[in-house]
């Protein structure tokens, strides 16, 4: 309303997202109507423009992605590198939980709580069969309902903020990337595993960079929405302790331009 009356209106980036999960539908609902959209870094502005500026609504509105050249996330990355990480064996894994609500998202495969809960349960059982402790980082939006799902199945349900709890684990396991937690996790020096049924939806050049930092596990969504993952690849990623300390992607999206 203010924008249509000629007022200069600024909208703000959610945080830690660099469009690794392209979300054209959600983006058009929440962002494309904004003329001035503030993002923290040049790398993020570049990717938002790449993925969304060709949308009809953005062409009509003239959406501009404005980089404020923030060094906040890069300073976190620099600080997190001081964390001692000389792993020989993976003893404790944290699975990043999906919110147990009724929303469906189209930006990645299997983005519905029923399918995610089914996947998370199978991952927990399989990883525990390898002799590794499994903790579950509950999504804060649906904390109480999640507790009832996983109590007695995992070794611990983590309720503290990720930023305050990541140092207490050996490996981080994600089943989706459209989360501010994933963006922060990239700035740590912990090994990261991603069970990813959405490879074909991602930008090829970003995937090449991300594969230098993250261990991708092949997965697909079958006809009934179940995510099928490669157990051998997952076991190898856990037991071989492949940390992947290449941070080109982090430097690309969070680095400050001079």
Predicted regions and their residues:
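Donor nucleotide-activated moiety binding/catalytic core segment of transferases
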Residues: 121, 132-188, 198
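Short, charged/polar "capping" segments at the starts of alpha-helices
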Residues: 19-20, 44-50, 75-77, 103, ...
């Amino acid at each position: 309303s203010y924008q249509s009356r000629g007022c200069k209106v600024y909208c703000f980036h959610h945080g830690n997202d660099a469009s690794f999960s392209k979300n054209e539908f959600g983006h058009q609902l929440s962002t494309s109507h904004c003329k001035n959209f503030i993002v923290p870094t040049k790398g993020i502005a570049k990717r938002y423009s790449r993925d969304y500026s060709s949308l009809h609504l953005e062409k009509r509105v003239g959406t501009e992605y404005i980089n404020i050249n923030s060094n906040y996330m890069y300073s976190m990355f620099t600080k997190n590198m001081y964390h001692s990480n000389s792993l020989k064996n993976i003893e404790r894994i944290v699975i990043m939980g999906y919110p147990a609500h009724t929303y469906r998202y189209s930006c990645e495969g299997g983005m519905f709580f029923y399918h995610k809960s089914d996947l998370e349960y199978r991952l927990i059982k399989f990883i525990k069969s390898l002799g590794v402790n499994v903790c579950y980082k509950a999504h804060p939006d649906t904390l109480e309902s999640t507790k009832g799902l996983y109590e007695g199945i995992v070794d611990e349900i983590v309720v503290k903020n990720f930023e305050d709890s990541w140092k207490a684990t050996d490996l981080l396991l994600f089943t989706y990337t459209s989360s501010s937690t994933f963006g922060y996790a990239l700035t740590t020096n912990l090994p990261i595993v991603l069970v990813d049924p959405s490879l074909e939806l991602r930008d090829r050049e970003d995937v090449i960079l991300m594969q230098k930092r993250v261990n991708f596990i092949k997965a697909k969504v079958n006809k009934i929405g179940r995510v099928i993952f490669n157990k051998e690849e997952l076991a190898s990623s856990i037991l071989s302790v492949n940390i992947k300390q290449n941070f080109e992607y982090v430097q690309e999206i969070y680095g400050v331009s001079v």
